[in-house]
């Protein structure tokens, strides 16, 4: 493998939300495998999604995720494009199932975006909000004013813009809990069952 084009003293470390610093060794391996994945003679980006090599990559990714997140066998793992923003519309389109109301806990900018998108599909009940103190806390669950028949309760479990994070999993009883965990997924154990 060739020497890294970045000298260690010149390397910039990003500790911001979102993209993060990666070890140079990982980047170097990715660089080489991008061009020729495991000596297959082509890049992963050039492979057929039905081809043997790519099917093996997808199966290994699912197995790894199941192991890391302790996902039970009875659950499906979906690898979807679009990120959290697309899910703001995909979730209500798929989970309303005849319900008219969605409950939200509004803890910041990402919650507000999810609420705005959900309003296109259903009535939105903001069960709790920390807007009164500029989104600097998570409201205690005992203060939430939930709907009786909500399709689900939505939280953004880590508001990266304001720096507010749920350090607990809300008990929603029989109401499904939807958590936007896109900024901290796999950062701690989560009971997905």
Tell where the protein language model's regions lie, with residue ranges.
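Short active-site oxyanion
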Residues: 75-77, 100-103, 174-176
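PLP-dependent aminotransferase-like
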Residues: 85-153
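Conserved N-terminal alpha-helix of the aminotransferase class I/II PLP-enzyme fold
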Residues: 41-87, 94, 108-109, 117
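Gly/Ser/Thr-rich loops at beta-strand to alpha-helix junctions
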Residues: 19-22, 84-87, 108-111, 160, ...
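A glycine-/small-polar-enriched, mobile loop at the entrance of the PLP active site in fold-type I
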Residues: 11-62
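Active-site phosphate-binding strand-loop segment of PLP-dependent enzymes
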Residues: 18, 118, 129-185
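Basic/polar N-terminal segments that are highly enriched at the extreme N-terminus
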Residues: 1-11
